[in-house]
């Protein structure tokens, strides 16, 4: 499912002491670990995020590193537990890490979920069950999406609706999708793209 609870997995460290190293932290969970570590979806997440925001705004996930706590003990920070954002200038000059807007943050979190959804559909589309790369989706019956990225402008919102519709139509399994929204434009585009024989308004 994608809703407000999905966004709660992500929170900001604003580096209040130095105001330099601003980063979005990811709470430890199986969901992002599978997407980022096991499936290597970082490039796809970046691609989706830049599509809906700015092609120069680049997310960078951390590698594992060690820091000292107040008692001088080593603390290991796991890989893919933090992400920093910068604007790429097209040269070798290092870019300052920036804190993105709330709307951009929602787009990033949606991009993580969307990449997982793409991978899930791809896995379930395999006809021969013995050839599945993972069996953790075998019992999955429903995907629930609640008002994805409501802060997008109309053009990007239309693009988002079209992309979701194409992804749903690509599913060859018995997976069912429940999508809720308060946005009439998003609903109309999604409904028209999928076709009224394949979806219902509740």
Show the residue positions of the predicted features.
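Generic preference for hydrophobic/aromatic residues in regular secondary structure cores
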Residues: 4, 57-59, 199-202
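Glycine/alanine-rich phosphate-binding loops at beta-alpha junctions
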Residues: 5, 10-14
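Short coil/turn segments at secondary-structure boundaries
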Residues: 13-16, 191-192
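Extended helical coiled-coil dimerization/tether regions that scaffold
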Residues: 15, 19-105, 112-142
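Switch/communication elements of ASCE P-loop NTPase nucleotide-binding domains
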Residues: 97-202
